Amino acid sequence: MKKKKIIIFALLLGAIIVILVGWSVSRGKMYDYNYSEVAKKLETAPFNTNIPTKVPFEDMQLYDFGSNNQKVEFTLFNVDKEFLTVNILKDEIEYPKEIKKENIKIGRDVNGKYIPEHSGKRIILWQHGDLFYEIAFSYKLTPIEISKEQLIKMAESFK
């Protein structure tokens, strides 16, 4: 009887380890983004900008798009209702001083800021040329649904 309990415990422990390893591997994965719909919408935008070619979730689609003289904004989502909003502005994006911000590197030579939590979002900000970029992930339950590294990889994919 004792041997049977040990075998069951070992099997359960093994299953838990396999699930956790699989989750952590898939969590950091990036997916190619078919940006043709966003690129077509950008043809009418008031200024030229870069767009992401990689996203942290599979099958992201354009949900919303808007632009004016100072800003381009679009939101991507998928069937699991994971939302990413991209803002591209001519003016710097200001956040209150009391919000925790972390300095980050995007690629080799771009400095940015990472905000782990603000109003139900994880945010990354950076400047490229004369434009300011922001990616905001609206999480459903907790901020750990997306990692800082995934946001940085998405920022690095802007072309």
Enumerate the language-model features and the residues they cover:
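A short, sequence-level motif marking secondary-structure junctions
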Residues: 14, 88-94, 138-141
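Short hydrophobic beta-strand segments that form the core of ligand-binding sensory/regulatory domains
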Residues: 132-136
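Membrane-interface motif at the C-terminal end of an N-terminal transmembrane signal
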Residues: 18-32
